[in-house]
Amino acid sequence: MRKAFLFLPVFLSAVAPAFGQTKAPQPSTTAKVPSVVPIKEIVDKGTVSGRKYTNDKLNFSLTLPAAWEIKPNNFADDMLRQGVDIRLKAPDNLRPGDQAKVNQSLRRVEVLLTASRARFDSYQNAILRVSAEDLKPNPQIKDAVDYFDAVRASYKSMKLPADFVYSDTKAEKLGRHEFAYLDIDSAAGKKRMYATVQNGFAVLFTLTYSSDDDLQSLRTILSDGNFKLK
């Protein structure tokens, strides 16, 4: 069963709606499995200067266009105060034992950057979340293709929602760097997940979108990014 939860951090980011759209939990006197992973930084979060994000520890930088708004690091806390919970945590519909396994796996994940692109012709925004997952417990993962192949294997081992459809692992060269990616369709919307492996971490760029223009914008962001910082 351990392998089924090996890459659930990616599963959670794929299944969750754009902003989580989960109401903040109400106080309860019933003992529950802790649902939120305690904050513990596993890798440097990087820095933001204007519209440029840089992570020296993971050797990459990227610049977001003016149409994108970079959210502050306390964005999840701000959303929680508004009644929307987007924190990394196990889904409520899992059994307590499975929730504990998922939350344990989430200890290897760090959200590095969250950004959104508002569309004036639609009520739907595009949401970009950049995250990193520590691969030290899984030395067999050598590159992003290996990573997404493992993700797909864990998908196959679980009972997913009927509307959850995911693609084969694919690769795309954007600029000077090659990424693996998955496409996902579900009730939560369309997602494109790009990944690369940097210094022992899987770095994920997860886009929730409705317009192909937003997807093209992400492709341009990655094409123009520098993934060989020294």
Where are these regions (language model features)?
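Acyl/amide activation-and-transfer machinery of modular secondary-metabolite enzymes
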Residues: Y123-V130
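Sec-dependent N-terminal signal peptides
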Residues: M1-G20
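Long, charged/polar, surface-exposed segments that mediate recognition or autoinhibition
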Residues: V130-P161, L222
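N-terminal targeting sequences that direct proteins away from the cytosol to non-cytosolic compartments
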Residues: A18-S116, F120-S122, K136, M158-F179, ...
